[in-house]
Amino acid sequence: MARVGAPLGVLLLSGGHERAHYALVVAAGAAALGREVTLFATNAGCRLLLDPTPLLEDAREAALAERGVATITALLPAAAELGVRRIACEAGLRAEDLAGAALAPGVELAGVATFLAAVGDGQILTL
């Protein structure tokens, strides 16, 4: 699919299920519309990009599934298939004492400069 519109950067700071879930909703939605999307997780937000992510154990995950809402379980592979670039912040992993944790396949390890360069003059949404 040809990319259209300005790049979108999604900056995930929170380790909570609700914000991580919506970061994936926005990222996948924008990518489905043809936008170039970079999801950058830092600090507690890095937990979303771990393999496996502990967010799957959150009670909200089961509640969303029961209500027919796309879950993190469904959105993570969908975002990857749609071409969402996923980056875990190296400093954020260290700050959360996750430096040795396994990242999900396809997740890059980089810093904020890489994220900002990827987004360029595009939009940044912080969750």
PLM features: residue spans?
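N-terminal beta-loop-helix "entrance" segment that forms/cooperates
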Residues: 45-58
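N-terminal glycine-rich phosphate/adenylate-binding segment common to multiple enzyme folds
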Residues: 87-127
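Hydrophobic/aromatic ligand-binding patch that stacks against planar heteroaromatic rings
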Residues: 26-30, 78, 115
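Histidine-anchored nucleotide/phosphate-binding helix
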Residues: 21-33, 39
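Short, glycine-rich nucleotide/cofactor-binding loops
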Residues: 9-21
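Short, flexible loop segments at the rims of nucleotide/cofactor-binding pockets, characterized by
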Residues: 16, 62-66, 102-105
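Short internal beta-strands
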Residues: 37-43, 86-90
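A glycine-rich helix N-cap at a beta->alpha junction
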Residues: 57-87
